[in-house]
Amino acid sequence: MAAVSLRLGDLVWGKLGRYPPWPGKIVNPPKDLKKPRGKKCFFVKFFGTEDHAWIKVEQLKPYHAHKEEMIKINKGKRFQQAVDAVEEFLRRAKGKDQTSSHNSSDDKNRRNSSEERSRPNSGDEKRKLSLSEGKVKKNMGEGKKRVSSGSSERGSKSPLKRAQEQSPRKRGRPPKDEKDLTIPESSTVKGMMAGPMAAFKWQPTASEPVKDADPHFHHFLLSQTEKPAVCYQAITKKLKICEEETGSTSIQAADSTAVNGSITPTDKKIGFLGLGLMGSGIVSNLLKMGHTVTVWNRTAEKCDLFIQEGARLGRTPAEVVSTCDITFACVSDPKAAKDLVLGPSGVLQGIRPGKCYVDMSTVDADTVTELAQVIVSRGGRFLEAPVSGNQQLSNDGMLVILAAGDRGLYEDCSSCFQAMGKTSFFLGEVGNAAKMMLIVNMVQGSFMATIAEGLTLAQVTGQSQQTLLDILNQGQLASIFLDQKCQNILQGNFKPDFYLKYIQKDLRLAIALGDAVNHPTPMAAAANEVYKRAKALDQSDNDMSAVYRAYIH
């Protein structure tokens, strides 16, 4: 295939990872953003998603030449919105060109009329005028506006100077209609975090900093800037403000349902231990976003699917840790987490100075603190990062990540957290994330038990369960969680999205957390008893919504 010449400002179709070709525009990267080594590539701003990425030239195609082809093979609402955004951009550009041409014509007519009125009568003066105009045009070059020489001799400014002031804008200066496609300079980083939950909207102008930007973009800049310390100081200042106001730092990840051009995968080798309901979705998204991943699972057969998708196989946890830079683990409970680290061929045997371990399991604070101590004692770096969500959210890359421990490691995990979740919170020292996660799941588990209790009460009092759900969905309690769990119960579908045995485990640990600080948890304790009854009815491996069966038996 013949090589296609591309340049700054061209509209293109860009292919990123496994995502379909997406319409974008070649733009200038931020000032200090390093270009990846290797093959030639361009910095592309994608329409519709506001994402951006370095794209290899062989993954780019001219927009107009391949428009019909791409529209035929790609479908979906987001894709159509992106194409519509391109067409709107083209219409604005065309309209501006027509307006500019019309204005130029009007100016020319007005100047010609003025020249007719002030034109000298003598032949010598006409020749002087012609020579004078010729000099001006020669100095101004092609495309410059004609200016009357008669007025130039009388005015305070030379024709050339006035013509330069009236000339079109200089190349490189973005037109106002293209402001939403302009890449911010690194100097605008100071204004890039408007708040802990700032959404990623990239609409800079030439004179003001970016506002409401995704703080994950800071990590993208830091990973590729030649002067990360300068950028980091501005970012840290904003983060400190968030910490002072909320007690934590929140980082909003890019919308994982969009084309994640903003996710530049880390060049670090990633390991992942544990391919259960949550771990499987996490690994799948890491691979989709281009990370290099080595997997291990106690049941080796679960690794096969991911090997086919491009993952590497580790024979033991120790081998995975020793061959990877950052190793994540997601297992079921405190005992499994300890066995994984301290057991034969465990994580600890692979830890050397500089190796990083991120435990995503939901465990108690004492367990995670113990694990952190043994990892750090071997020269390793430790981060706890339990996740709030379920299997579907894991598959969709929309988990909420609660992290605590090594702040630098948290920053290093940025692209991984973007791939697997929609939001991440940094909560300070080790143990804080474990406590927060247990509290979150305590609330969720208690709420689920209350939902089941309400549905059964409606049934025994002769009320319609469906009507109860409809009423709840129209009120302040309306949520995806409420609707999904009620639908599970009404349909008798208890396929696990969050195992009942695990929510009961979290309730038990949350109650113990309350006991440790002498804080009463009567609601959680009551809910825990209902889940224990459901487990006795052989519902452990069903979804948490199967707690409903504890009320009807």
From Swiss-Prot:
GO CC, any one term: nucleoplasm
Q: List the disulfide bonds.
A: none
Q: Where is the composition biased (Basic and acidic residues)?
A: 92-145, 162-182
Q: Interaction with KDM1B: where is this region?
A: 216-225
Predominantly, its location class is nucleus
Q: Which domain of life is it from?
A: Eukaryota
Biological process terms from the Gene Ontology for this record are: transcription elongation-coupled chromatin remodeling; transcription initiation-coupled chromatin remodeling
Q: Where is this site: Required to promote KDM1B demethylase activity toward histone H3K4me1 and H3K4me2?
A: 217
Q: Name one GO molecular function term.
A: histone binding
Which compartments is it annotated to reside in?
Nucleus; Chromosome
Region called Disordered, residue ranges: 92-188
Q: Which InterPro entries match?
A: 6-PGluconate_DH-like_C_sf, 6PGD_dom2, 6PGDH_NADP-bd, GLYR1_PWWP, HIBADH-like_NADP-bd, HIBADH-related_NP60_sf, NAD(P)-bd_dom_sf, PWWP_dom
Q: Where is this region: Dehydrogenase domain?
A: 261-553
Q: Which residues bind DNA?
A: 168-180
| Outcome of substituting residue 223 to A | Impaired KDM1B-binding and abolished stimulation of KDM1B demethylase activity
Q: Where is this region: Interaction with histone H3?
A: 214-217
Give all Phosphoserine modified positions.
130, 167, 540
Checking Pfam families in the record gives: NAD_binding_11, NAD_binding_2, PWWP
Domain text from the record?
The A.T hook DNA-binding domain is required for the interaction with MAPK14. The PWWP domain is a H3 reader and strongly binds DNA.
Subunit and interaction comment: Homotetramere. Interacts with MAPK14. Interacts with KDM1B at nucleosomes; this interaction stimulates H3K4me1 and H3K4me2 demethylation. Binds to mononucleosomes. Interacts with GATA4; the interaction is required for a synergistic activation of GATA4 target genes transcription.
Per its UniProt record, what PANTHER family does this chain match? CYTOKINE-LIKE NUCLEAR FACTOR N-PAC, OXIDOREDUCTASE GLYR1-RELATED
Stated family = Belongs to the HIBADH-related family. NP60 subfamily.
**What protein name is recorded for this chain?**
Cytokine-like nuclear factor N-PAC
Its source organism is Homo sapiens
